[in-house]
Amino acid sequence: MPWRKDRFCWDALLLAGGRSLRMGTDKASLVVEGVPLLQLQVRRLREAGASTVWISHASGPAPSPSRHEDIRWIADGAPGLGPWPGMRQALQASDADALLVLAVDLPAMTPCFLRRVANPASHGVGRIPETPHGLEPLCALYPLPAAAVASEAIAMDGEPSPRRIAIRGIREGWMQVMAVDEADAPALVNWNRPGDWSPVAPGTGA
């Protein structure tokens, strides 16, 4: 959706096309709180205020978390290259003011945390969380068109990635670092191995 004087509009890109080799199964299909993790994350993004949710998935027929969800699918036609191919397509296709990129395997993510990420200081500025472990480019808001232009420039002289785009944005002033305190840091912990999985989202109790 286009920029309006009284409203900042952002789309979301949910990254669900990874091969999940260490997990041994598709992370997006893990059942959490009674629904597939993919559907849970779509719900959280909607509650946070996303205008459109794009989903980057592995090549092949697009599954659907719910026939009622207003979502758009992006086929990852370059497996093994990480999140970049899906992010590039979404940056080019979205007509929102910004794109919030989210990895599907962050089970403790909350709509409240996502709203903080999607609340930049001003129009044209994105936000990227930073914990003591570093920047979190797979849960960050990238402003358009600056991020799209930067991604193409990076692709011309090296291997592009969300991290490189974010670092360039910080350097050029169109990405803002959002410090994350210890209480909120669990929202950014991902699941990588079978032992990490739980049918209850971390932090919600039994």
Regions inferred by a protein language model and the residue ranges of each:
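Nucleotide and nucleotide-moiety/phosphate-recognizing core
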Residues: 2-160, 167-187, 195, 201
